[in-house]
Swiss-Prot record:
Residues 13-48, 51-86 form the EF-hand domain. Induction: By growth factors in early G1 phase and probably by cell-cycle regulation in S phase. DNA methylation probably plays a direct negative role in suppressing S100L gene expression in tumor cells. SUPFAM superfamilies: EF-hand. This protein binds two calcium ions. This is Protein S100-A2. The gene is S100A2. GO terms for molecular function: calcium ion binding; calcium-dependent protein binding; identical protein binding; transition metal ion binding. A subset of epithelial cells including normal human mammary epithelial cells and keratinocytes. It comes from the Eukaryota.
Length: 98
């Protein structure tokens, strides 16, 4: 049976997290360095050419609910939900929505 588009998208969200989280330290959490690399490589149109260090520090601080200096999967999922809401809001203002 073929996976639906949404199921494929969910699989990509999960595998992308683990692709970066296993590089250093706790393999189930993103360190600041892992998060920076994920943002740079996977969301280039959101962060531009270079990840802003001050912006990354603020982002990590706002995502890191338990203050362990890392982003766990639940915190990552909240981040993706926020980006998804922003994209939805943006496209609602476009005459030819995707």
């Amino acid at each position: 049976m073929m996976c639906s588009s949404l199921e494929q998208a969910l699989a990509v969200l999960v595998t992308t997290f683990h692709k970066y989280s296993c590089q250093e330290g706790d393999k189930f959490k993103l360190s600041k360095g892992e998060m920076k690399e994920l943002l740079h490589k996977e969301l280039p149109s959101f962060v531009g050419e270079k990840v802003d260090e001050e912006g990354l520090k603020k982002l990590m601080g706002s995502l890191d609910e338990n203050s362990d200096q890392q982003v766990d999967f639940q915190e990552y999922a909240v981040f993706l939900a926020l980006i998804t809401v922003m994209c939805n809001d943006f496209f609602q203002g476009c005459p030819d929505r995707p």
